[in-house]
From Swiss-Prot:
The keyword Transmembrane helix applies. This is Cytochrome b. Binds 2 heme b groups non-covalently. CDD domains: cytochrome_b_C, Cytochrome_b_N.
Length: 379
């Protein structure tokens, strides 16, 4: 008799996606991050749901409701810190996942890659709106500064900002709509994840060599399920350690001060995972130019498949491209550090140099080095 998992209409889909899925035998731990992101999304939706049961999206009570969650709700402090630090874990996994895709040439699956870029934007939007909800000083001023960037759009900028704010400043209407969108977006993200997986399973997974692995496939279960579970344990241990030992390590102390429109914090900055883009924004002295650079710093991922000049897919056997890739990683770390520093000498010039290098490496140096490698290999 045929197994029910192969005949049942619903189980059949799950079976072909997670059990009998043929997977390349050479996948390294860099392929764990997709499933880790799924766990992160699950943790965020669950903790967020329970937080939403106690949170009030009103400027008068939002800050106090978060305090109430931490002090009076059973394990409310745990929910709150799991949710806040879970976002950090989400972005760590997200950036490593994108980095893996860049290194091993996974972007040649253009549909999967483009849905991934949409997912990245959706997660960034969700995280930004979530940061506004506790209604602390950095929540309020972060929302004011970032939404105000849209006023740089010619003709419609000012009206667009007021439309998003629901008034002439960040206020009750803004907080309420941000809460509504923050609640809604994770479910849209879940739908996009399904589309992402649908496109991935159309082509099959890439592997570290970048060479088609059709002759050498193994079933996903038990080989990769057990490997994924090990990844879950490592990540959840790290998250638990962060939450239980230093929950405020990645947060901003200013967010423990209730929002006050009359008092500006000395340094307005977003959460650490946006600092690289924030540094690029600040390094251009023109408002519209800065906004365009900010958007392009992420959107540049969409043109990477066009810029792929190498005859080889993966960087595994391309040492010169590897050097450039790790230089790009170093530049991103530098930008993240600069984003958290005040706007003064020497940070300004370091940020500008790193921003130029970021675009130069991706747009010019990587394609040029790929062509050189082709020539050296007599292709």
């Amino acid at each position: 008799m045929t197994n029910i998992r192969k005949t049942h209409p619903l189980l059949k889909i799950i079976n072909s996606s997670f059990v009998d899925l043929p997977a390349p035998s050479s996948l390294s731990s860099w392929w764990n991050f997709g499933s880790l992101l799924g766990v992160c999304l699950g943790v965020q939706i669950l903790t967020g749901l329970f937080l939403a049961m106690h949170y009030t999206s009103d400027t008068a009570t939002a800050f106090n409701s978060v305090t109430h969650i931490c002090r009076d709700v059973n394990y409310g402090w745990l929910l709150r810190y799991l949710h806040a630090n879970g976002a950090s874990m989400f972005f760590i996994c997200l950036y490593l996942h994108v980095g893996r895709g860049l290194y091993y040439g996974s972007y040649t699956y253009s549909e999967t890659w483009n849905v991934g870029i949409l997912l990245l934007f959706a997660v960034m939007a969700t995280a930004f709106m979530g940061y506004v909800l506790p209604w602390g000083q950095m929540s309020f001023w972060g929302a004011t500064v970032i939404t105000n960037l849209l006023s740089a759009i010619p003709y419609i900028g000012t009206e667009l900002v007021q439309w998003i704010w629901g008034g002439f400043s960040v206020d009750k209407a803004t907080l309420t709509r941000f809460f509504a969108f923050h609640f809604l977006l994770p479910f849209i993200i879940t739908a996009l994840v399904m589309v992402h997986l649908l496109f991935l399973h159309e082509t099959g997974s890439n592997n570290p060599t970048g060479i088609p692995s059709d002759p050498d496939m193994i079933p996903f279960h038990p080989y990769y399920t057990i490997k994924d579970i090990l990844g879950f344990l490592i990540m959840l241990t790290a998250l638990s350690a962060l939450v239980l030992f230093s929950p405020d390590l990645l947060g901003d102390p200013d967010n423990y001060i209730p929002a006050n429109p009359l008092n500006t914090p000395p340094h307005i900055k977003p959460e650490w995972y946006f600092l690289f883009a924030y540094a690029i924004l600040r390094s251009i002295p023109n408002k519209l130019g800065g906004v365009l650079a900010l958007v392009m710093s992420i959107l540049i991922l969409a043109i990477i498949p066009i810029l792929h000049m190498s005859k080889q897919r993966s960087m595994m056997f391309r040492p010169l491209s590897q050097c450039l890739f790790w230089l790009l990683v170093a530049v991103l770390f530098t930008l993240t550090w600069i984003g958290g520093q005040p706007v003064e000498y020497p940070y300004i010039i370091i940020g500008q140099t790193a921003s130029v290098l970021y675009f130069l490496i991706i747009l010019v140096l990587m394609p040029a080095v790929s062509l050189m490698e082709n020539y050296l290999l007599k292709w």
